[in-house]
């Protein structure tokens, strides 16, 4: 999914200050990690620059890298494709934690449709593409593969073990290993780095795959949504029990859009309060407010680098705003092949600093 979401003026100031801080030497108790997503997108054209970006990330020596999904733009959703991406993750010389986006399963189209989209289809392929947008075919999802089967394959390739990806994997706690109600959710991970709790949630773009014209997908989406909310709650419960200094949450979907929110959130929720992301937003908002310490939410999906506070709700003059402890980092995406180095220093009140990583 791609959209444009411009930086707000005050967010630009925030970025500037935090980038300067990120360049300073780290204290003994501090560490850094890297976040990226929506890359490498246009294959194989993007791969040389993606390889240089991986080298740049490795040179930064992060504790780990988080990839927030959309590992390609459009590609057949086959085990071969997934394993090819897995091989690229092996080029990172440190742990890689990956949470799925929409392009690698919810948006998976039949190969004939992909060829036509790419302009290399046969006459028959092009005819199928044209017919795919007619009402009966669109309503029946005829241009898609079995996306739930694709998700099963994706899980078997990327999440076969209770550990991260990358050439130097680290152990992870996974929701699917410890919660019998959500045993399929092996992609939801949690770990502790120097007193900061990290967690990933499987929340893709494309309406979180809530499909009112597909009963099986809608049921699976509702179950996954409940699992994500339970994982968010348990993450903050662990953070409170361990007196963690901060919490970092990572998922794929851009859950906010341009426009003012209301008393519930400062920015408008994508799809509205009752839409596919509303309950995830409210769970993060309320558990983060109760936690009271710095919380960082990382997402991709919109392909635009943003640092802001979309949860924050201003109060009356002289009153502190609500939910101002939640900062959001939205990572770069195609056509840019870039990442963000995040420094973590719990000796500072803001905890998080940000430094874009570029390659030619």
Identify the role of each PLM range.
Residues 2-14:
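Bacterial N-terminal signal peptides that target proteins for export
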Residues 12-23:
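Bacterial N-terminal signal peptides
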Residues 27-84, 88, 244:
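N-terminal active-site segment of His-dependent metallophosphoesterases
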Residues 38, 65, 70, 101, ...:
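Divalent metal-coordination and catalytic microenvironments
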Residues 42-44, 73-75, 103-109, 207-211, ...:
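Active-site environment of divalent metal-dependent phosphoester hydrolases
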Residues 55-64, 192, 199, 215-311:
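His/acidic metal-ligating clusters that form di-metal
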Residues 80-227, 231, 312-343:
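Extended active-site neighborhood of metal-dependent phosphoesterases/phosphodiesterases
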Residues 340-360:
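A short C-terminal boundary segment appended to hydrolase-like catalytic domains
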């Amino acid at each position: 999914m791609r959209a444009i979401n411009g930086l707000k003026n005050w967010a630009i100031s925030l970025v500037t200050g935090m980038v300067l801080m990120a360049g300073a030497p780290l204290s003994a108790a501090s560490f850094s990690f890297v976040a990226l997503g929506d890359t490498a997108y246009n294959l194989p054209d993007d791969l040389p620059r993606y390889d240089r970006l991986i080298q740049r990330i490795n040179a930064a020596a992060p504790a780990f890298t988080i990839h927030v999904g959309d590992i390609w733009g459009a590609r057949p959703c086959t085990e071969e494709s997934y394993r090819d991406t897995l091989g690229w993750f092996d080029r990172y010389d440190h742990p890689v934690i990956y949470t799925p986006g929409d392009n690698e399963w919810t948006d998976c189209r039949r190969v004939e449709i992909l060829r036509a989209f790419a302009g290399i289809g046969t006459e028959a392929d092009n005819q199928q593409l044209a017919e795919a947008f007619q009402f009966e075919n669109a309503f029946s999802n005829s241009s898609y593969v079995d996306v739930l089967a694709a998700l099963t394959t994706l899980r078997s390739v990327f999440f076969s073990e209770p550990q991260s990806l990358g050439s130097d994997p680290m152990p992870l706690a996974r929701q699917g290993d410890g919660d019998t109600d959500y045993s399929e959710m092996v992609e939801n991970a949690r770990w502790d780095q120097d007193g900061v709790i990290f967690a990933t949630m499987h929340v893709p773009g494309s309406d979180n795959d809530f499909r009112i014209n597909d009963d099986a997908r809608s049921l699976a989406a509702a179950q996954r949504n409940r699992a994500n909310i339970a994982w968010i709650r348990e993450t903050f419960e662990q953070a409170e029990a361990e007196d963690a200094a901060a919490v970092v949450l990572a998922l794929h979907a851009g859950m906010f859009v341009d426009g003012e929110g209301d008393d519930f959130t400062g920015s408008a929720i994508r799809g509205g309060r009752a839409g596919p992301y509303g309950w995830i937003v409210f769970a993060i908002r309320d558990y983060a407010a109760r936690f009271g310490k710095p919380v960082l939410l990382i997402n991709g999906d919109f392909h635009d680098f943003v640092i802001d506070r979309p949860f924050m709700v201003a109060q009356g003059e002289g009153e502190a705003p609500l939910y101002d402890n939640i900062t959001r980092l939205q990572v770069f995406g195609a056509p840019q092949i870039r990442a963000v180095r995040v420094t973590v220093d719990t000796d500072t009140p803001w905890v998080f600093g940000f430094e874009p990583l570029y390659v030619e």
